[in-house]
Amino acid sequence: MPGDSPNALEQGQTRAERIVERILGLPEDELADEYARLLSVLCGRHRDVEKVFLQRYENARELLRGSFSASGARAKLIGAYFSEEYAYQSAALFNPSIVRHPDQSGCPPGALRFILSLRAIGEGHLSSIAFRTGTWQPGRDIVLDAASPLAATPRIEYPESDDAAVHLHCDDSRDLSETVLFPILERQRGGIEDLRLTSLEMEDGSTLFAGTYTAVGGRGIAQELLATRNFIDFKMHRLEGLIAASKGMALFPRLIEGRYAMLGRHDNENIWLLLSENLHHWDGGIRIVNPRWTWEFTQLGNCGSPIETADGWLVFTHGVGAMREYCIGACLLDRSEPSRVIARTRRPLLRPSPEERYGYVPNVVYSCGALLSGNDILLPYGVADSFTAFSTLSLDALLAAMD
């Protein structure tokens, strides 16, 4: 809704009410011409644009307490005046996480389809969650599917209480690249950042794609949980507990001794192990990894959910060193007792190259997850908070490089 100035000349009406009044007073021929012009501009860029206009018309009526009524093109034009386009990835597309695609049909032998989640930044440094799909065949190319030029607006079911989940229905998306999860709540008004997605095996044997992200609100940050079973219907649920007001939490992909497990960094310096019987409530924890090498002296955190291997839980880490240079390393945790660190990398696996030092935030390489297939690892990572690149490495070689 357009805001009101305290210096407005007209008193007794809001600016929004004055806009509606002007549209209601338009002669039919002017109305028809303006609406036709608007459709000619927008229909090639958006799908079901008239449906969006009608929804915005209903939103405007609700916000203005039903003080007006219109139908047909006039109602849609009112909706258009309370709409705007937003280039959600115009500034950056980075900090990816990655999971196996639930549909592996049609994949070449030995290949793997995957889903990337990405942090997209648009005008005003506002972050949202975007998705891409692709195919990876170890030893060969990584092929990203062509992204749709369109983005679809989800249908939103708001909760009755602040503690309940928000439901997002993205059935209008014809391709996953059209699905954009935008900040929609007051506690997310500064953006939603760095989704760490994993494939979580539930107690009943089913799979839930779930991950934490950082909600940036007017009063600070907090961790929230995104969950879906089909990448069409999503739930956004706030996390509770003493460490919910932090960044960089990452779920283990299965329960450990009957409890959910999470890595966190609620002291802004070390990696902690957290266990909980409630997926949405997290307290306490044990500090398990602390800064040791020069490239991680400032702080240490995870780069996504742990990956289970025969040798232990593989955790990619990020370390911050001099000049706030972000590098990527790794450590290995015991499978049955993940509070025990078996080994870790003395030197970074990835650090910003000369070509990667310049961007929105210089001197940064960062990831929110990796994918293991056999002995091969696919590690997508963000560069300088600007774009996304990919690296591949051997699990055996990585473990051999640890101390």
Which role fits each region the language model picked out?
Residues M1-I192, T198-M249, R254-T298, E308-Y360, ...:
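Beta-rich carbohydrate-recognition and catalytic domains
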Residues W295-C303, N363-Y366:
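Donor nucleotide-activated moiety binding/catalytic core segment of transferases
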